[in-house]
């Protein structure tokens, strides 16, 4: 049943000291009023492409939809920053947010799309776990931590690094780094097989229509006792990025 698992109510055996560095948990919410599309349209990047009106109309419609699906923190959901919603089922999603943030960066001076991730960090568990899907109404995790569909893919580090390369915000990088390390450590401990390879699920990897599983397994929820090559590559990419972050921040204590 959706929404029955609350952050940090379980007894865990692997609590991370890094969580003490997570400044998003319990932070004062940012209640800055949301921008309205009609007020900021002229401040958005203005494409010039002669004889391609349909493409330009699509471009502007994408921005209109984006700014029409922004949300704010509430007392009930425990969010700390305004965010872009996936416009799907009243939840924020780790995977969807990462890709929306990738185009949202072109409007960063208007709205901090990157702050969508703040709400995932604010709901990080004491052992490093972050649920990939969080209810916007009450802030509850939709999945329990050890459900194969509970989290992933590990793409937040990739997105945060891309923002750093674009904007050079070292203060932001330093703030999110312990959250990302703790999350990676959780994934390494709980979503791997004995040989160090990773598993996931259709929902967990973001490709819930990929026909890779034997028909006896659920395509969305099961790991099928398989090694998931995309999950392995996502983790490799995350590790490489976390190493780059550690070099920038001078925090090599996490590098083997």
Question: Language model features by range: what are they?
Answer:
Residues 40-51, 98-110, 155-172, 233-251:
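Well-ordered alpha-helical scaffold segments within catalytic/enzyme domains
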Residues 1-92, 115:
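Low-complexity, Ser/Thr/Pro/Gly-enriched N-terminal "stalk/linker" regions
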Residues 43-68, 107, 120, 125-129, ...:
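Active-site acid/base region of carbohydrate-active enzymes
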Residues 3-28, 86, 127, 131-155, ...:
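The feature captures the catalytic groove of carbohydrate-active enzymes
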Residues 89-92, 146-152, 156-166:
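C-terminal capping/lid segments that line or modulate ligand- or cofactor-binding pockets
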Residues 86-87, 91, 96-100, 171-173, ...:
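Alpha-helical scaffold segments that form or flank carboxylate-/histidine-based iron centers
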Residues 90-124:
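Alpha-helical support elements that line or immediately flank enzyme active sites
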């Amino acid at each position: 049943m959706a929404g029955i698992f609350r952050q940090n109510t379980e007894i865990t055996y692997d609590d991370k000291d890094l969580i003490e560095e997570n400044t998003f948990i319990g932070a004062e919410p940012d209640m800055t009023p949301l921008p309205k599309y009609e007020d900021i349209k002229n401040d958005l990047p203005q494409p010039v492409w002669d004889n391609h009106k349909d493409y330009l109309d699509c471009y502007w419609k994408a921005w209109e939809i984006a700014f029409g699906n922004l949300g704010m923190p509430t007392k009930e959901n425990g969010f700390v920053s305004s965010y872009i919603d996936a416009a799907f089922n009243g939840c924020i999603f780790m995977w969807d947010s990462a890709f929306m943030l990738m185009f949202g960066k072109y409007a960063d001076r208007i709205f901090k799309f990157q702050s969508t991730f703040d709400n995932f960090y604010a709901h990080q568990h004491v052992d490093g776990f972050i649920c990939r899907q969080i209810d916007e109404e009450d802030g509850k995790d939709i999945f329990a931590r050890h459900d194969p569909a509970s989290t992933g893919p590990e793409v937040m580090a990739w997105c945060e690094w891309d923002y750093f390369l674009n904007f050079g915000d070292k203060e932001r990088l330093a703030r999110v780094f312990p959250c990302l390390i703790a999350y990676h450590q959780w994934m390494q401990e709980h979503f791997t097989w004995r040989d160090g390879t990773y598993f996931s699920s259709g929902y967990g990897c973001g490709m819930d229509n990929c026909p890779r599983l034997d028909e006896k397994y659920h395509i969305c929820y099961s790991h099928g006792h398989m090694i998931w090559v995309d999950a392995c590559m996502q983790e490799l990419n995350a590790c490489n990025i976390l190493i780059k972050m550690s070099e920038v921040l001078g925090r090599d204590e996490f590098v083997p």
